[in-house]
Amino acid sequence: MVSDSHPASGTSASDGSSLSDATRPSGRDGSDPGDYISNDDISNDDIRRPVAVIGAGAVGGSLARRLAVRQVPVRAVLSSRQAPARELATDVGAAVASDDVRDLPSDVRRVFLCVPDDALPGVAAELAKVDHPWSDTIVAHTSGARPASDLQALDRVGASLLSFHPVQSFATPNASAAFDGIYIGVEGHEVGIRYGSALARRLGATPFPLTAESKTRVHCAAALASNGFTALL
């Protein structure tokens, strides 16, 4: 079963400049993660490879709908809640709607986990048991606080990992337009960062580099900014 009751992200920020200042630590290999932000070597065909979205809540639904609007095909929607999965799959033209990760299409090479933070390791472990060409697959999650390494079960089977964090709040699964002009933090393996950066631009957002160490600081700062702004209203 897939757990996907993802709470709406509470990490909207009104000033992207403060985010970039918090993302300067070097990457896990000693390099600057910003080195991978350029998408010069990512072809349009690669960006448009079919995607599977796991989770049909506010974040998963909004992401899937935005992907479809930007002509990135969504091949499968996997969710523990079958009715929302079927509705989302119908809306985005996905051929597969299921509550079983074993139904992940074998030709999908881009997988997005839009599930609660505490469910990430378990869902990753379930996926890792699936007979799939993981060494040719990028697996991303959309958590603001958790690093890409939370998907370590998939790392062990050869997948490239990506944390793809939209710095935005999603109140409903239909908030496709909420991606307009936002920032998306990217962290993980080099292949994942390159893809995530190019995809963020495709969605109409601006990518910025994160490290596992800086993610929590950025998440907390954005949450405080969002909550502070709300308190002023």
Locate predicted features.
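Conserved dinucleotide-binding and phosphotransfer motif residues
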Residues: 70, 157, 203
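Short, hydrophobic beta-strand segments that form beta-sheet elements in well-ordered domains
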Residues: 75-79, 139-142, 184-187
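Phosphate-coordination loops involved in phosphoryl transfer and adenosine-cofactor binding
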Residues: 47-50, 136, 181
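NAD(P)+-binding Rossmann beta1-loop-alpha1 motif at the extreme N-terminus of oxidoreductases
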Residues: 2-10, 15, 21-36, 40-99, ...
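Rossmann-like NAD(P)(H) cofactor-binding subdomain of soluble oxidoreductases
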Residues: 92, 98-175
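Internal alpha-helical scaffold of NAD(P)-dependent oxidoreductase catalytic cores
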Residues: 84-91, 176-218, 225-233
